[in-house]
A protein has these predicted regions:
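Conserved N-terminal subdomain of the carbohydrate kinase-like
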Residues: 2-6, 18, 25-110
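Phosphate-handling active-site elements
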Residues: 29-33, 193, 219-233
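Short, small-residue alpha-helix embedded
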Residues: 142-143, 202-226
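Conserved phosphate/ATP/ADP-binding segment of small-molecule kinases
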Residues: 117-192
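Nucleotide and nucleotide-moiety/phosphate-recognizing core
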Residues: 83-96, 168, 182, 188-191, ...
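Short pre-catalytic strand/loop immediately N-terminal to key active-site residues, enriched for Gly-Thr
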Residues: 7-13, 192-206
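Charged C-terminal helix
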Residues: 49-52, 227-276
Length: 276
């Protein structure tokens, strides 16, 4: 069985963070493991507290995983401080980790800040160069590129700037658009691939970014090329949104079980182009 590791924060409400990561990875048929960067007191209405682990303890968790069940892919989510980012980068370089997906989580769905401003610079310097792909949303891409994004041309310019600066592929997510959910994959050489997506009428989007990046990592772990891994991950996320789970008083979580259909039934429904 293929394996994947998520390095991210814990969401006490279960909708985002490592909880969403583990669910998404499991539904995409890999053995999922975790190293926790922080505990958050969080629900669908906001984040009321963040308790970081120490860099030393984070390193211990990563060591425990790599020295026993080596992950075939690694997803990195919420890392709120520079020392933790530096620790992750050092350990991943030491173990020569493969198929690294970085979701540069900066703001929760509820609007709460999740990363210190100085940590963004460290993220760019230490982790992005190790990544196979990073998965910013529109707001995160604006921070990383310094450009305002209001349409497809802006998405293209921002993604090209980030990819050239960081030396890795960039999947700029279009889910914050008012008209569609098209995502743009851009490589450092300027090659672009658009992934069309249908906007789903569902206000409950807590954990969508975590879910997508974890599903991408899971499919990279299974040996799919990046473009294919993204297509499969988008298909899974779309179905999780379409399940229309409605929990909590704010922006609620996704249904990672896809309405209880089970992974085998879901996989039978994935288009042939995605299976191949």
């Amino acid at each position: 069985m293929k394996t994947a590791l998520t390095i991210a924060g814990s969401d006490s409400s279960g909708g985002a963070g490592i909880q969403a990561d583990l669910k998404a990875m499991t539904m995409n048929c890999v053995f999922a493991m975790s190293a926790i960067t922080a505990l958050t007191a969080q629900n669908t209405t906001g984040v009321s507290g963040i308790f970081e682990v120490s860099p030393e303890f984070l390193a211990q968790q990563i060591d425990a995983v790599f020295t026993d069940i080596r992950p075939c892919a690694v997803k990195i989510g919420m890392v709120s401080s520079a020392p933790l980012i530096e620790t992750i980068a050092e350990r991943l370089r030491f173990y020569k980790a493969e198929h690294i997906v970085v979701d540069p989580v900066m703001v929760a769905t509820s609007g709460s800040d999740l990363i210190a401003s100085d940590a963004v610079r460290t993220l760019r310097r230490e982790l992005f160069p190790l990544a196979e792909v990073i998965t910013p949303n529109r707001h995160e891409a604006e921070v990383l590129s310094g450009l305002h994004i209001s349409g497809r041309a802006d998405m293209s310019a921002a993604a090209r700037a980030i990819a050239a600066d960081c030396g890795c592929a960039v999947l700029l997510k279009g889910g914050h658009s008012d008209t569609d959910a098209d995502d743009l994959l851009t490589f450092p050489d300027g090659t672009e691939i658009w992934f069309p997506g249908k906007r789903i009428a569902n206000p409950n989007t807590h954990g969508t970014g975590c879910t997508l990046s974890s599903a991408i990592a899971a499919n990279l772990a299974k040996g799919f090329a990046l473009e294919e891994a993204i297509a499969r991950a988008k298909a899974y996320l779309t179905d999780a949104l379409n399940a229309q789970l409605d929990l909590g008083r704010g922006s609620g979580p996704l249904d990672h079980t896809l309405g209880g259909v089970g992974v085998e039934n879901w996989m039978h429904g994935v288009p042939d182009a995605v299976h191949k």
